Amino acid sequence: MLLSAKTQAESLCGLEIQADSADMARRSIAMNHLEDRISVIQGDIKEADKLFAAASFDVVTSNPPYMIGQHGLTNPEAPKAIARHEVLCTFEDIAAQTARLLAPGGSFYLVHRPFRLAELIVTLSKYKLEPKRMQLVYPYADREPNMVLLQAVRGGKPRMTVEKPLVIYKEPGVYTEEIYGIYGY
């Protein structure tokens, strides 16, 4: 829903593998009267080619599961484990389907963990999704980054811009001015 507030896109379509999460998203869309702009389909990214026509999206966004194998603690609650760990799909699955769904010149935006950055760039390039912009996200200015934001373009030419870092908090519970600006406070 934040995307609908921050973009002029005529329509947004979400794909969610977990039925409960898809239902929750649909209820939120209805409560905010956004049914005319946003739809949610419950389905598997690995089968997106059966749900959507090739090259049918100008933009694809993803907040994929970050952890592989035994990285981090696996949540005993299945829905949370599926959201955080590559249980039902891998980043390669997401990249392969994104390359098929994006129109030539279309953009893929994703958030991931910096410890997987090399793998992400290699995988994106493998599927002709050229990394164009990268921004590291820091929880605090004096900490290591814990997220990376990437934009890749289908069929783009090689050249990546590294944006200035994004810092979330000035101090515990207090956002930086940049974050307030992003969220419109």
Q: Where are the predicted features?
A:
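Conserved Class I SAM-dependent methyltransferase catalytic core
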Residues: 88-145, 149
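A short acidic, Gly/Pro-enriched loop at the edge of an enzyme's catalytic core
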Residues: 50-60
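Conserved SAM-binding loop
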Residues: 25-26
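SAM/dcSAM-binding transferase cores
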Residues: 144-185
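Conserved SAM-binding loop of SAM-dependent methyltransferases across substrates and taxa
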Residues: 1-10
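Conserved SAM-binding strand-loop segment of SAM-dependent methyltransferases
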Residues: 33-45
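Mobile active-site "lid"/loop adjacent to the S-adenosyl-L-methionine
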Residues: 64-93
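Conserved SAM-binding motif I beta-strand of class I
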Residues: 11-16
